[in-house]
Amino acid sequence: MKEIALLLDKSGSMIGLQKTTVKAVNNFICEQKLIHPKKRLSLIQFNEKRSWTYEHQKLKDIPTFENKDYQPSGLTAIYDTLGDVIKKYENNNTEVTIALLTDGYENASRKFTAKKIRKKIKQLEKHKKWKFIYLGADSSTFLDAEILGISKQNTAQIEASEEGIPIAFSLMQKMISNI
């Protein structure tokens, strides 16, 4: 079974993009339902904490993501989010694609370091055929992804705007289809 784990930044800097992000997530899920109806999806929202909106759900069973489900606030704990998600999945025999979308940079992780995450990513890509996608709006997006061991071909710099977020999810869709 293949699964997509969508890690969605819900830090305070995303406040002005709430409606656009919700719509883009719904469009992404609808497209995935058409392309990969048997896949499962987990949607993990993160700031300095993580919340699992959908967990290991079949795409066909996922309800509409609503504005009330996405309330941005707080800081951005990218390493802790990746670490927690990897820890949750790594003992399953599931082929996972982790797709992370952030408008900022790491500023709140307490449990995991970039070095620990990089080591895990390399192990999972080599031994379990996991894939990692990193979409970021920060000017250091490619460097941030490289530090984590995520390849340039699976990394993109996006624009955190009403126009940029839908484009980012469309790009994510293509990246997932190509791996």
Model-assigned labels for residue ranges:
Residues 1-179:
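Acidic, low-complexity intrinsically disordered regions
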